């Protein structure tokens, strides 16, 4: 039997790059890595209603630049920017470097794998039928420009006694074509019967250029959104 490799790790430095973009000297690497993990966990836990797709952390000289990709930036920014300033101060206390926050709006959450996976997880927790949730997510993604979508749900689906895995796919989803622009994400649904796992693959076309930042550029162009610097 063949084994499916992680589409993100497989394409690093080919058409996508890391979400932590910095270089550390000597023994600082472990400390900075722990800081990144704490920052991401804090943001995801503090802002669950903001529909956050990913958090990109860059560390130029004595600065921690955090870019939050979210479908609902207004939840993060708050009225007249009050909430984002509170968030910046809290993040500032978690790192020794100064913190700069950028909010990137995702205009098409239907073709963002992380948001699709989290949306299905939320529906399963609300006891929506898993087949209906999967089919609705696939059709929405294809309608907004995805060339192929595959969704897998595993666990005690529908409260069944025996756990199983169900999947649904429409279109083309190449798993081993390196030039393919495949977005992948996982999420968990904590239901009354236990934890269900959701995996989402979204194929958005092919990237012919060998450019690690190509996927980020294409996402910004597709979303037709701008970065909102706050400081």
Swiss-Prot record:
KH type-2 domain ranges (all copies): 39-107
InterPro entries reported for this sequence: KH_dom, KH_dom-like_a/b, KH_dom_type_2, KH_sf_prok-type, Ribosomal_S3_C_sf, Ribosomal_uS3_bac-typ, Ribosomal_uS3_C, Ribosomal_uS3_CS
Superkingdom, taxonomy of origin: Bacteria
UniProt keyword list: Ribonucleoprotein, Ribosomal protein, RNA-binding, rRNA-binding
GO annotation terms (biological process): translation
Pfam annotation, one family: KH_2
Gene3D superfamilies hit by this protein: 3.30.300.20, Ribosomal protein S3, C-terminal domain
Any one GO cellular component localisation term in the record: cytosolic small ribosomal subunit
Gene Ontology molecular function, alphabetical: mRNA binding; rRNA binding; structural constituent of ribosome
Ligase as UniProt keyword: no
Xref: PROSITE patterns: KH_TYPE_2 (PS50823), RIBOSOMAL_S3 (PS00548)
Function as written in the Swiss-Prot or TrEMBL entry: Binds the lower part of the 30S subunit head. Binds mRNA in the 70S ribosome, positioning it for translation.
Family as reported in the entry's similarity comment: Belongs to the universal ribosomal protein uS3 family.
Subunit note: Part of the 30S ribosomal subunit. Forms a tight complex with proteins S10 and S14.
Protein name: Small ribosomal subunit protein uS3
Name of the gene encoding the protein in the UniProt record: rpsC
């Amino acid at each position: 039997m063949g084994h499916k490799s992680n589409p993100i790790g497989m394409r690093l430095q080919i058409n996508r790059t890391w979400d932590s973009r910095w270089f550390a000297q000597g023994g600082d690497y472990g400390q900075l890595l722990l800081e990144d993990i704490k920052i991401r966990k804090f943001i995801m836990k503090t802002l669950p209603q903001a529909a956050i797709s990913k958090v990109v952390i860059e560390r130029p000289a004595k600065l921690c630049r955090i870019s939050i990709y979210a479908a609902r930036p207004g939840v993060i920014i708050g009225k007249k920017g009050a909430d984002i300033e509170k968030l910046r101060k809290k993040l500032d206390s978690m790192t020794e470097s100064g913190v700069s926050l950028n909010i990137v709006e995702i205009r098409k959450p239907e073709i963002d794998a992380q948001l699709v996976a989290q949306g299905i997880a939320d529906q399963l927790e609300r006891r929506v039928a898993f087949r209906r949730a999967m089919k609705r997510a696939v059709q929405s993604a294809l309608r907004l420009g995805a060339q192929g979508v595959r969704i897998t749900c595993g666990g005690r689906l529908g409260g069944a006694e025996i756990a199983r895995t169900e999947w649904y796919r429409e279109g083309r989803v190449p798993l081993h074509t390196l030039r393919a622009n495949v977005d992948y994400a996982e999420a968990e649904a904590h239901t009354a019967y236990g934890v269900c796992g959701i995996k989402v693959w979204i194929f958005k076309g092919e990237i012919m250029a060998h450019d690690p930042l190509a996927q980020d550029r294409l996402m910004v162009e597709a979303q037709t959104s701008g970065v909102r610097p706050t400081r």
